[in-house]
């Protein structure tokens, strides 16, 4: 039986780097080797569309945690609104005793963190320390994230990319 992975992502059509990475995963061997369920927490559009997408995602995630019971939750996070949307997912997974991998994409996450008050920094640390692993996109990001989570829990995985054959001929 395949292990179940719930991947928490932006909409497959949203603009941005996380979407490119996630769409690469969707079309890779990963979805053959694991039973992957994707939950979209963000979409491009109006405030109403974005809020509706997030609320719908929380309900889907609660249902998934309770009834599908994934072996792992893989959260793709960034700074700003992305952090806050994923924080609730991490909290729900933690309460459900589901391990979480936090894949941090935001190049400006360290600045987001550093500009926060001590109280908000502690909140960020508390949430991110509920994750069993944190994925950094470079050694430099690993150093920055080590201010928030224990360095031994951080792994460096460069952005996923697919080369188009016509570009390398």
Each language-model region and where it sits:
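Cofactor-binding loop segments of dinucleotide-utilizing enzymes, especially the Rossmann-like FAD-
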Residues: 10, 41, 105, 139, ...
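Donor nucleotide-sugar binding/catalytic pocket of nucleotide-sugar-dependent glycosyltransferases
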Residues: 123-125, 129-167
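N-terminal subdomain of nucleotide-sugar transferases
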Residues: 1-43
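A short, histidine- and acid-enriched strand-loop-helix "catalytic/donor-clamping" loop
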Residues: 78-82, 98-117, 132-133
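Nucleotide-sugar donor-binding and catalytic loop/hinge architecture
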Residues: 1-4, 164-169
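An amphipathic, basic-hydrophobic alpha-helix
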Residues: 34, 47-96, 119-122, 126
């Amino acid at each position: 039986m395949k292990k179940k992975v719930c991947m928490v992502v932006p909409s497959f059509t949203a603009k941005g780097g996380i979407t490119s990475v996630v769409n690469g995963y969707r079309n890779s061997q990963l979805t053959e080797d694991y039973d992957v369920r994707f939950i979209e927490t963000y979409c491009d559009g109006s405030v109403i569309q974005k809020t509706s997408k997030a609320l719908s995602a929380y309900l889907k995630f609660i249902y998934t945690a309770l009834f599908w019971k994934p072996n792992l939750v893989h959260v793709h996070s960034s700074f700003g609104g992305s952090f806050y949307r994923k924080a609730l997912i991490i909290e729900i997974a933690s309460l459900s005793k589901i391990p979480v991998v936090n894949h941090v994409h935001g190049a400006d996450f360290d600045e987001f963190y550093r500009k926060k008050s001590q109280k908000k920094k502690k909140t960020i640390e508390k949430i991110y320390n509920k994750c069993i692993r944190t994925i950094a996109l470079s050694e430099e990001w690993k150093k920055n994230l080590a201010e928030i989570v224990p360095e031994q829990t951080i792994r460096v995985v460069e952005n996923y990319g697919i080369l188009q054959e016509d570009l390398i001929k």
